[in-house]
Design a protein with these regions (language model features):
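Flexible, glycine-rich phosphate/dinucleotide-binding loops
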Residues: 20, 43-44, 152
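Short beta-strand "acidic-cap" motif of Rossmann-like dinucleotide-binding folds
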Residues: 35-37
Length: 155
């Protein structure tokens, strides 16, 4: 998988709650150029350069290079990043999910990775957990899977 540095890169964080704010703070400390947040309210927060309401997601995705998903599991967030929205991301974009596995359509993600429609992805959360041995994600191109441990790590 191609490597992209945090320094001087732009990030979009889907979910500006506790996890999203912690991610933004760490990215800022490592030199991220711009951090955009998406939340239910779109209310500004000092951890983000810009914050938009979730209703703007389809407008933000086409200009997203690195998407960090930090959403809770609610009826509104189930498969919020679905096949149609994955298709809105640029082909050189990365998807990182550290929130809840239900927020991402994993079959659509695997299909996009295998078709070269995304540069790569990293998943710390899946649905279900643990991921079954025969799940197509295990064979997806340019995918890193970790066992839901990112919250216990220190930088």
């Amino acid at each position: 998988m191609p490597v992209r540095s945090i320094r001087d890169n732009e990030f979009t964080i889907l979910g500006t709650g506790d996890i999203g704010r912690h991610v933004a703070d760490r990215l800022r400390g490592m030199g991220a150029a711009k951090i955009v947040g998406l939340s239910r309210s779109g209310k500004p927060h000092p951890a983000f350069d810009e914050v938009y309401p979730i209703s703007a997601l389809d407008d933000v995705l086409p200009r997203t290079k690195i998407l960090v998903m930090a959403l809770p599991s609610t009826p509104e967030t189930v498969h919020i990043l679905n096949r149609e929205r994955i298709a809105l991301l640029p082909a050189d974009a990365y998807v990182i999910n550290v929130g809840r596995g239900t927020a991402l359509d994993q079959v659509a993600l695997a299909d996009a990775l295998n078709a070269g429609k995304l540069a790569g992805a990293a998943l710390d959360v899946m649905d279900p957990e643990p991921l079954p041995k025969d799940d197509p994600l295990w064979d997806a191109r340019n995918l890193i899977i970790t066992p839901h441990v990112s919250g216990n790590m220190t930088l």
